[in-house]
Amino acid sequence: MSEYQYVEHEFAPVYNEESQVLVLGSLPSVKSREHGFYYGHPRNRFWKVVAAVLGVPEPLTIEEKKRMLLAGHVAVYDVIRACEIIGSSDSSIRNVVPADIKSIVAHTPIRAVFTNGKTAGRLYKKYQAEHIALP
């Protein structure tokens, strides 16, 4: 059986002064950390779905992914800054240190926050939602 590891978030949030929608995950998976960017597992459909929603070709490189997000006014980050976790198992997450979502929202015209999974949604509600004022 795998053991718990203390993991600190390795990626900066992706946003700019024009971001209007914030998509939050829980914490980058092992594969994403190996890849060096959000949603890096080859079977993850995030980039395909966002590209389809925005009506643009699916990005292949990290720089293309960042450009697509920013051009589409989409910000991406995670609700966890650090935690203990077994592998990539969201159900094993414990001892959460929440990420600073409030400062992103304070410096952007974010109008909506979406979470991309049950754990991200639960942790957003627990640690951040009450501190975020959306229009």
Tell where the protein language model's regions lie, with residue ranges:
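Residue-level preference for short coil/turn positions at secondary-structure junctions
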Residues: E17-S19, L70-G72, P109
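Short, surface-exposed acidic-centric catalytic microdomains
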Residues: K31-S92
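Short His-Asn-centered micro-motif
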Residues: L24-G25, Y77-D78, T115-K118
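A short linear-motif detector with a strong N-terminal bias
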Residues: M1-E3, N16-S19, V53-P57, S92-R94
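Glycine/proline-rich loop-helix segments at beta-alpha junctions forming the active-site rim
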Residues: S2-H9, P13, C83-P135
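Active-site and ligand/interface coordination hotspots across diverse enzymes
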Residues: M1-K48, A106, K125-E130
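Aromatic-residue detector
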Residues: S26, G55, P59, G121-Y124
